Each structure stands twice: as C-alpha cells, then as structure tokens.
C-alpha cells in the first residue's frame, strides 16, 4: 500500500507540474507586445464578446448543474454529488482559462507575426499549449486527488462501490459541461460564420474579416468559444471519462486480487507520465529552415509520442510490472501485453492524425477534388463535398477496428481500455494543436481589421491555413478517442450489470432479474440498436437546424445594417458589432438546451420504456445496452463524416485565396464564380465540422455515462 501511496502522490505531482507550466506560459504570453492602439481596440471587442457569451453560457449550465447535484446527493450519496461537482467545475474552469488566454494571445500573435513568422508561430502555439496542459493537468488532478481523498482520507477500499460511483459521477459532471459547451459554442461560432459569409462575401463581395462586415467581431468571438473553450471541455471530458472507465474496469476485473491497487493506479500513472512528455514535446515546436509550419507542429507531436513510449514503460515499472497480473475471462493478463496495448493506442493516434490531415489538408486529393468541382458550380461543389465526407469515414474506422481487435487479443477489454488511456495521455499536446487554430484565425482577423501591411496578413494566413488543418486533425483524434472511450464505458456497463446481477442478495433490485442477453436474436436488442442509432442523426439534425436559424438571424441583421447605414460600405459609418454578438449569444443559449438534453435523457427513456412494455428488467437492460452500441457506432461515423468533410470544404475554399489552377490549366482567383461556389460549400461544411460533428462526441459518451449512473441508482434502491 505504501508503494501505491507513493505512486498516487507522484501522479498528483505530475498534474500540479502541468498546471504550473501552464501558469508560466500564461505569464510569458501576456508579457508580449500588444501592437497598435487600433489592434488593441479590436482585440478588446473580441474579449468582451467572448467573456459575455461564456459567462451567460455557464450561468445557464449552472442551473442544470445544481439540479443534477441535488439529485446525485439524494439518489446516490454526498460523495457522488461532490464527484459531479468536481468534474463540472474543473471542466468549466479549463474552458474559461483557455479562452481567457486565447482572446489575449490573438492580438499579440498578430503583432509577433508582423515581425517574423517564427515569432507568430511560437506565441500562438504557446497559447494553445496553455489550454492543452490545463486540460490534461486539471483532468488528471480531478480524478487522482478525488481518488486519494476517497481511498486514503475517507478510508474506502479501491474497488468499493462508493469510490466507483463517485468517480463515474465526476465523469458525468465533465460530460454535462462538455455537451453544452461544445454545442452552444458551435452554434454561436457557425451562426456568425455562415451569416457573415453569405452576406459579406457572396452578396456584398467584401473579403473575410473585413471591418465593414457587422458580423466580423462575432465571427472572431465564435472561434474562441467554439474551438478553444468547446474543444477544451470536450477533451477534458474524454480524458476524465476514459481514465475513470478504465479504473472501473480494473476494479471489476481484478476484484479481490492482490494486484487491484496497482491496476487501479496504472491508468493514472500512464496519464501522469504522458503529461510530462507533453510538456517536453512543446519545446520541440520550432520553425525549421524549410519554413514548414505544419512540420514544426508535427515535430512536437512526434517527440511527445516517442517520449510517451518511455513514459508507458515507467508507468509499467512503477505499478503493474511486466509479468502476469491475473486472469480475466480465461485470458492471462501480463504487464508486457498491457504495455504493447498502450503502444497500439499511440499508433492509432498517429494513424488517425495522418488520415485526417490527408482528407482535410490543402494540396491533397480530397480537397483538390472539391475545389475542382467548384469550377462547374455550386451544386457540384456540394455533391463532391458530401462524397469526400462519406469516404473519409472508411480508413479511420479500419484503424479503430484494428486497434480494438489487436488489444483485445493481447489483454481483453482491459487492454483496449489501456490503449484508449494511452491515446488520451497525450491530449495535452493534441489540444495545444487545436487551440493554436482560433488564435491564428483571430490574429488574421485583427491584422485585416487594423489595416496592417499585406505581408502581415500573408504571415497570419499561412498560420491560419495550418490552424484549420490542426483543428480538423484534433477533431479526428477527439472522435476516435471518444468512440473507443465509449466502447470502454459500454464494457464497464455490461460488466457492472453482470456484477450486480451476480450479487442480488446485496442489491435487491437485481435479485429476481435473470440473465441479460445481448444476443441479436433478442428483438429488444435489435430495437435498442435502432433506437441508439437514431440519436446521433437526430442530435446532428437539431444542431444543424440551430445553426441555420442562428445564421439566418445574422443574415437579417447584417442586411439591416447595410440597408440602414449605407455609409458602412464606404467606411464613413461604423457597424454595430455588439448587436450581432448579443443576438448570437441569446440564440446559442436558447438553441443548445433541448439538443443537449437528448443524449442525457435517452438512456432513461429506453430503460423505463422497455421495462413498461415488456415487464422484464433483463429485456430493459438488454435494450439499453444495445442502444449504447447503436449510439457509439453511428455516432462515430456521423462525427467523422461531418468533421472531415467540413474541413475539406473549408480548405477547398481557401485554395482559391491564392488562386486555384483547375484540370484545364485555368487559374481561378478570389471573387471568381468558382470561388463563390466554394464559399457555398463552406457554408454547409462549417456547421458540419464545427457544430454538429464535434458535438456528437460528448453525446456518445454522455449516453454511456448516464447508463452507468442509472445502474448505480438502481443498485442503491432497497
């Protein structure tokens, strides 16, 4: 136990180091030059809009959170309610601090880029690293410190139901914040983007980020609340939920074993080691002699991955060792096999990054095919974009299947869980790549609105083009890890259910239930699969509709300002930027509530609906379990299709910024008919990649977390 205590303290120290590094980086970023007075005025407007939106969003979520906290206290225990509170608060804090830095780094990045491309890259990436390492550090601290409190201070055994229920509740707290932040931020950012583009670029013929567009500030605000705060909450949730699910599986599989304590600490130690490797990886991000921005970022990612192999070895040595740990479902589990599972997790991460970059990167076949289709019109652009979005699901799915089968063969479901934990271990570096995107996007907008030298805009555009790809790549990673993480949660659900059923004398609700079969010949299983499968589509449809409504409101507002203030187009009158920001804030908050509650309530409706119809608890649990699989499988494909397809549409549009040469050798410039067709495609792709697709991620996980909590609540019933 003493060794276990030392390992747990070491894990906590790793989390603290991550937060301290983020604090150091914050001071470094805020010390940089803010540029001209005009640049600072624009940045201040973006800051005010982002803070106003996030404050209102969190105030709304807090109302829901208080209700859930009280329910968790009443239905489970105070410890479970406190777990929920810890997960929710830390998730919110991560997003808020990340956005707080992002909206201050944008103007500093624009100023640094005016001096050198390398300076702009360094500042933007350092800003992203703050968010990334806060995500990893606070998620790790949340789980490890609360586990320490429960097992050391309060004296519960590691596999005690109080510990498991409290950790699952922590994951639920993170999930609830995540789905609201992802969806609300996505509706805001894409409502501004779509509305502003349709009137500004297509109707008025003015360029992106032109200060004459009343939606420009709202668009830049949206980049931060969607891609920075939203992604931070998403990956915080995936990180926390995956670690918790792996610990739950360890508690179930190794219950009563001498190895139990070390098995429970193993995923925490993996994450602790990988936090350190992520910090080290940030120092490798330097612009090389070839001037490749993506190459500089990949150096950091590759260094993190290679160092993490050593980190996995350290985690093994300090916890489970290298020999046999125990036998699970007739399969011998060894430390060496678990180490290999961790390696497979890192390989899956690398492959998903490469595949996503191929489908979304400029000068690659998929993006070029959409740009070429734009030459023949708006319709062909949309058709080709949809084709690419559908095609982009195949290779990631094959990689994920390979990861599942290989890890299962090596170490069963616990091996798969360790692979996903290793994937999430390097989340600090991945989120850094993502949060780099909104900073560079904003920097370009500030350079344009402040009227800086065209060479500065050229530098920020180069950073922004890479930022677009990194945002797409990190979404691919987030979806892949979410899909595998949800599979681990499903494994926790099915094994938890089996545990309760086998101990009916302790948990009376399950005493007379009988065996639960997930056999496909069971009609309730098929019904559950179909019901679960519809949730990502319905959820995605609701999200797209919300963006359409918000975008439509922005279109009307921008048209009104152009109509009532004709001096805007000549530069004699100033647009009312705050009006568009306020309009979108209200729309996003209003539109996010119902879609966000869909995946939360769906598992409860499935269970009690089937129980009411069939009168059989076994049938209801089978239908619920099947619905979780339906959500995972369809959610995975819907999310990949939307994010990769949307990213390809976006970069196809950017192909025309410097001129696109078609198959016949004709060059199409910005403002051409082909460019206008690409803008139409991008207005479809934007809500695909930044609202509906990413929001499916937390929807997948929250359905599984709610199902786990439902089991816990029923087990507490006398």
UniProtKB/Swiss-Prot annotation:
Reactions listed under catalytic activity: diphosphate + H2O + H(+)(in) = 2 phosphate + 2 H(+)(out)
Topology with respect to the bilayer: Multi-pass membrane protein
Keywords: Calcium, Cell inner membrane, Cell membrane, Hydrogen ion transport, Ion transport, Magnesium, Membrane, Metal-binding, Translocase, Transmembrane, Transmembrane helix, Transport
Compartment(s) of residence: Cell inner membrane
InterPro entries: PPase-energised_H-pump
Domain of life according to the entry: Bacteria
Site keyed Important for ion transport: positions: 182, 227, 234, 690, 701
Binding of Ca(2+), residues: 650, 682, 686
Binding site for Mg(2+) 2: 220, 223, 441
Residues at which Mg(2+) 1 binds: 193, 197
Binding-site positions, substrate: 190, 689
GO cellular component: plasma membrane
Cofactor(s) needed for function: Mg(2+)
This enzyme's EC code(s): 7.1.3.1
GO terms of molecular function: diphosphate hydrolysis-driven proton transmembrane transporter activity; inorganic diphosphate phosphatase activity; magnesium ion binding
Residues of the site described as Determinant of potassium independence: 471
Residues that span the membrane, as ranges: 6-26, 61-81, 83-103, 112-132, 133-153, 168-188, 235-255, 265-285, 300-320, 335-355, 385-405, 413-433, 472-492, 524-544, 593-613, 620-640, 695-715
Function of the molecule: Proton pump that utilizes the energy of pyrophosphate hydrolysis as the driving force for proton movement across the membrane. Generates a proton motive force.
Quaternary structure (record): Homodimer.
Family assignment from sequence similarity: Belongs to the H(+)-translocating pyrophosphatase (TC 3.A.10) family. K(+)-insensitive subfamily.
PANTHER family in alphabetical order: K(+)-INSENSITIVE PYROPHOSPHATE-ENERGIZED PROTON PUMP
Descriptive protein name: K(+)-insensitive pyrophosphate-energized proton pump
Organism: Brucella melitensis biotype 1 (strain ATCC 23456 / CCUG 17765 / NCTC 10094 / 16M)
């Amino acid at each position: 136990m003493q060794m276990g205590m030392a390992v747990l303290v070491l894990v906590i120290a790793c989390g603290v180091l991550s937060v301290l590094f983020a604090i150091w980086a914050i001071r470094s970023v805020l010390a940089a030059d803010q540029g001209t007075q005009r640049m600072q005025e624009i940045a201040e407007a973006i800051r005010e809009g982002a803070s106003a939106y996030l404050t209102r969003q969190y105030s709304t979520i807090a109302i829901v959170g208080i209700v859930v906290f009280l329910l968790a206290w009443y239905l489970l225990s105070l410890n479970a309610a406190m777990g929920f509170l810890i997960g929710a608060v830390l998730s919110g804090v991560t997003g808020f601090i990340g956005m707080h830095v992002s909206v201050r780094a944008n103007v500093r990045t624009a100023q640094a880029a005016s001096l050198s491309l390398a300076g702009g890259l360094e500042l933007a990436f350092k800003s992203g690293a703050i968010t990334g390492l806060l995500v990893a550090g606070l998620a790790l601290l949340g789980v490890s410190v609360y586990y320490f409190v429960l097992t050391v201070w309060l004296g519960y055994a590691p596999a005690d139901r109080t510990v498991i229920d409290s950790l699952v509740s922590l994951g639920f707290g993170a999930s609830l914040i995540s789905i609201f932040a992802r969806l609300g931020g996505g509706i805001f950012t894409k409502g501004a983007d779509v509305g502003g583009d349709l009137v500004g670029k297509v109707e008025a013929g003015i360029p992106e980020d032109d200060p004459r567009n009343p939606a420009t500030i709202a668009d830049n605000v949206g980049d931060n609340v969607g891609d920075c705060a939203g992604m931070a909450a998403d990956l915080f949730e995936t990180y926390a939920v995956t670690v918790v699910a792996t610990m739950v599986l360890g508690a179930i599989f190794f219950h009563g074993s001498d190895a139990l304590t070390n098995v429970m600490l193993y995923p925490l130690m993996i994450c602790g080691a990988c936090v350190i490797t992520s910090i080290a990886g940030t120092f490798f991000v330097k612009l090389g002699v070839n001037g490749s921005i993506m190459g500089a970022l990949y150096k950091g990612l590759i260094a993190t991955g290679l160092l993490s192999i050593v980190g996995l070895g350290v985690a093994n040595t300090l916890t489970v060792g290298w020999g046999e740990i125990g036998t699970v479902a007739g399969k011998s589990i060894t430390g060496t096999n678990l180490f290999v599972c961790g390696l497979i997790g890192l390989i899956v991460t690398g492959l998903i990054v490469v595949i996503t970059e191929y489908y979304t990167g400029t000068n690659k076949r998929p993006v070029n095919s959409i740009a070429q289709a734009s030459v023949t019109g708006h319709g062909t652009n949309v058709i080709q974009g949809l084709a690419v979005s559908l095609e982009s699901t195949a290779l990631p799915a094959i990689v994920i299947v390979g990861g599942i089968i290989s890890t299962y063969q090596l170490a069963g479901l616990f091996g798969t869980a360790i692979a996903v934990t290793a994937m999430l271990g390097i989340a600090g570096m991945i989120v850094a790549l993502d949060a780099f995107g909104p900073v560079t996007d904003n920097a370009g907008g500030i350079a344009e609105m402040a009227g800086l030298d065209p060479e500065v805009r050229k530098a920020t555009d180069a950073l922004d083009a890479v930022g677009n790809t990194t945002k797409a790549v990190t979404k691919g990673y987030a979806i892949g890890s979410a899909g595998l993480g949800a599979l681990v949660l499903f494994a926790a659900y099915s094994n938890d259910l089996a545990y309760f059923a086998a101990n009916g004398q302790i948990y009376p609700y399950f005493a007379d239930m009988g065996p639960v079969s997930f056999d496909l010949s069971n009609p309730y299983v098929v019904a559950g699969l179909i019901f679960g499968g519809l949730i990502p589509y319905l959820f995605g449809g609701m999200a797209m509709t919300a963006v359409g409504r918000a975008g439509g409101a922005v279109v009307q507002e921008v048209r009104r300002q152009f109509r009532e203030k004709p001096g805007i187009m000549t530069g004699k009158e100033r647009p009312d930027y705050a009006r568009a920001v306020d309009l979108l804030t209200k729309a996003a908050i209003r539109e996010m509530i119902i879609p966000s509650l869909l995946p939360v309530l769906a598992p409860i409706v499935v269970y009690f609906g089937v129980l009411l119809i069939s009168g059989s608890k076994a049938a209801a649990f089978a239908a619920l379990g099947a619905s979780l699989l339906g959500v995972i499988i369809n959610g995975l494909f819907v999310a990949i299709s939307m994010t990769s397809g949307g990213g390809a549409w976006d970069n196809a549009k950017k192909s025309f910024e410097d001129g696109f040469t078609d198959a016949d050798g004709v060059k199409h410039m910005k403002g051409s008919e082909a460019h206008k067709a690409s803008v139409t495609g991008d207005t479809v792709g934007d809500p695909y990649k930044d609202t509906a697709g990413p929001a499916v991620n937390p929807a997948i996980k929250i359905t599984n977390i709610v199902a786990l909590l439902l089991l816990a609540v029923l087990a507490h019933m006398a």
